[in-house]
Regions:
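Inter-motif core of Ras-like GTPase G domains
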Residues: 113-130
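P-loop/Walker-type NTP enzyme "switch/lid" segment
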Residues: 2, 7-17, 24, 29-105, ...
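Residues within well-formed alpha-helices
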Residues: 21-22, 26, 118, 122
Length: 130
């Protein structure tokens, strides 16, 4: 487990290159290793936030199915929090470090150079899918 907070920006100005998928898969892998992970969804389309909601809906569906079948419910969850954010928050990396511990994965939007630049400046590590 980390003793500090590491900010990781998954960024590219181009859309459709897999930023959200990359961010969520990295977060999932780290969470499965027992790391504390938070995804900050700075993408105005809310892809990571929607992903989180889809998992919640699927968990509810499975719970109802398990109840109907009389079987124990095994929770279906991401294993980390997804928080909607914006460039103002990203511009305060010290506040992010105070609030969130472990790994903070930042999912950035396409076609918003300002938010992408702010995320890259805040990050300790940048991943640019292509």
């Amino acid at each position: 487990m980390l003793k500090s907070t590491i900010l990781v920006a998954v960024a590219d100005i181009k859309g459709g290159v897999g930023k959200t998928t990359t961010a969520m898969l990295i977060a999932g892998c780290l969470a499965r290793r027992g790391e504390h992970v938070t995804v900050l969804d700075a993408d105005n389309t809310g892809g990571a936030t929607l992903w989180d909601e889809y998992v919640r809906i699927e968990d509810d569906r499975r719970r109802k199915e398990d109840e109907a079948n009389g079987t124990p419910h095994k929770p279906y969850k991401l294993g980390f929090d997804v928080i909607q954010t914006n460039d103002v928050i990203l511009g305060m990396p010290d506040r992010i470090r105070e609030r969130y511990k472990g790994w903070v994965i930042i999912d950035t939007p396409p076609s918003d150079a300002g938010t992408v630049q702010t995320a890259l400046q805040a990050a300790d590590v940048s991943i640019i899918p292509c």
